[in-house]
């Protein structure tokens, strides 16, 4: 008797949620990473994918214990020269995916407390206008010759 009752309750629960959207209320951050930096380098960047929640939101700030200053940056290319500039926010449309990537929009880390070493992790806390603060674990990947972040101009 108990088994049948449990089965019926499970079936009712499944029906109750059948039409429910499983989209998160808040943005969901995945694949957060950074490139390793050589000793003496004081800047780095963090990249990630942000999946918008049920409502549009804006990434408005970030901070990390690993850096004295953390800004949101975009990269513009003009006459073959890439130039970074600080931006106030990153729009996160409802239900849409936004990718922060090299040579594009990213989280800029300035005044690093030491090199970012491949295989290590560190935390960047993102602040969204609606969803509030969200700590994100960033994995440091090996550096490559094709994207030396320190070569960009500010």
Regions found by a protein language model. Give the residues of each.
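Intrinsic structural disorder/low-complexity segments
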Residues: 10-11, 152
């Amino acid at each position: 008797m108990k088994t049948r009752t449990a089965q019926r309750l499970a079936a009712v629960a499944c029906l109750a949620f059948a039409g429910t959207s499983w989209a998160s209320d808040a943005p969901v951050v995945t694949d957060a990473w950074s490139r390793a930096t050589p000793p003496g380098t004081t800047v780095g960047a963090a990249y990630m994918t942000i999946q918008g929640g049920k409502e549009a939101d804006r990434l408005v700030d970030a901070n990390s214990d690993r850096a004295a200053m953390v800004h949101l940056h975009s990269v513009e290319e003009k006459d073959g020269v890439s130039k970074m500039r600080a931006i106030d926010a990153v729009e996160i449309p409802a239900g849409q995916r936004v990718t922060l990537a090299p040579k594009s929009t990213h989280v800029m880390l300035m005044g690093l407390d030491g090199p970012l070493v491949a295989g290590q992790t560190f935390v960047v806390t993102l602040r969204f206008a609606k969803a509030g603060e969200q700590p994100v674990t960033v994995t440091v990947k090996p550096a490559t010759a094709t994207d030396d972040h320190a070569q960009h101009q500010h």
